[in-house]
């Protein structure tokens, strides 16, 4: 995916680096695969703010994405490439030969007209999905399941991927984008190839208004608050706030927050 840097004609254009969206071939979402999405403004059922700095933004329709890839043995053709406001990558609209339509995340290297297949065991071509036990070692994969049949959980955002580094009869070991090495069941599904739009990390909004279009409100710094509101607040004049901490007093730079008693820790080989 290509990005463009705008000329500094105005203040809002000076730092703007945005996507060109040249690849998109269909403007409106498929009606049978999209549903309405109600905005909460970060409030719960009693009207109290539970998620700060969230609200406003453009209306969105939620696209139903096929993360399970459980339509085995039936080939599909990539018919359209679409924008999805709910995620950082683009999505493909698939037409199966039996007439069904489904959305999947876009895969790097695929284009309109390519054929893909899901099965327990199939060829290692880009976009194909199969059990991890049948994927060769060293293969770049994405949309990895943690529980068989539940749908992809890992490596789903723009530019992300995992790598298969070891296999046994029951488990397979994968290296995640964070560098973590983790065991997953061999019967979990995974897609061959990495997620498209690796340039997403280079994008810059350039102005506050673009953040508001996306539904994100201004965030107040902790050091600008009073001591009653934040551990880093208060002090005479401008102060550093001391050791960086979040609103609950937990150190914010490099502090491990994962529960040490979590039962799934035994599947993590290296953090």
UniProtKB/Swiss-Prot annotation:
Pfam families: Ribosomal_L2, Ribosomal_L2_C. GO terms for molecular function: rRNA binding; structural constituent of ribosome; transferase activity. GO terms for biological process: cytoplasmic translation. Residues 257-271 have a biased composition (Basic residues). InterPro entries: NA-bd_OB-fold, Rib_uL2_dom2, Ribosomal_uL2, Ribosomal_uL2_bac/org-type, Ribosomal_uL2_C, Ribosomal_uL2_CS, Ribosomal_uL2_dom3, Ribosomal_uL2_RNA-bd_dom. Part of the 50S ribosomal subunit. Forms a bridge to the 30S subunit in the 70S ribosome. Belongs to the universal ribosomal protein uL2 family. This is Large ribosomal subunit protein uL2. The lineage of its organism: Bacteria, Pseudomonadati, Bacteroidota, Flavobacteriia, Flavobacteriales.
């Amino acid at each position: 995916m290509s990005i463009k840097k705008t000329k500094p004609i105005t203040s809002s254009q000076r730092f703007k680096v945005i996507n060109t969206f040249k690849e998109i071939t269909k403007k409106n979402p498929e009606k049978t695969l999209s549903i309405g999405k109600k905005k909460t403004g970060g409030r719960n059922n009693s009207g109290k703010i539970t998620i700060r700095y969230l609200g406003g933004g453009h209306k969105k329709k939620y696209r139903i994405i096929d993360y399970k890839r459980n339509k085995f043995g039936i080939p599909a053709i990539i018919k359209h490439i679409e924008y999805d406001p709910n995620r950082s990558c683009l999505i493909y609209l698939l037409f199966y030969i039996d007439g069904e339509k489904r959305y999947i995340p876009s895969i790097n290297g695929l284009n309109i007209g390519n054929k893909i297949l899901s099965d327990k065991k199939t060829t290692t071509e880009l976009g194909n999905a199969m059990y991890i036990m049948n994927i060769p070692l060293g293969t770049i994969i994405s949309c990895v399941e943690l529980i068989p049949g539940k749908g992809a959980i890992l490596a789903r955002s723009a530019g992300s991927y995992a790598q298969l580094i070891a296999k046994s009869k029951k488990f397979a070991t994968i290296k995640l984008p964070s560098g973590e090495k983790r065991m997953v069941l061999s019967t979990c599904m995974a897609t061959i190839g990495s997620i498209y739009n690796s340039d997403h990390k280079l994008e810059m909004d350039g102005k506050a208004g673009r953040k508001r279009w996306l539904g994100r409100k201004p965030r107040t710094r902790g050091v600008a608050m009073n001591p009653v509101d934040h551990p880093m607040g208060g002090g005479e004049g401008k102060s550093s706030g001391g050791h960086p901490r979040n609103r609950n007093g937990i150190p914010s730079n490099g502090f491990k927050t994962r529960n040490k008693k979590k039962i799934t820790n035994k599947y993590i080989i290296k953090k």
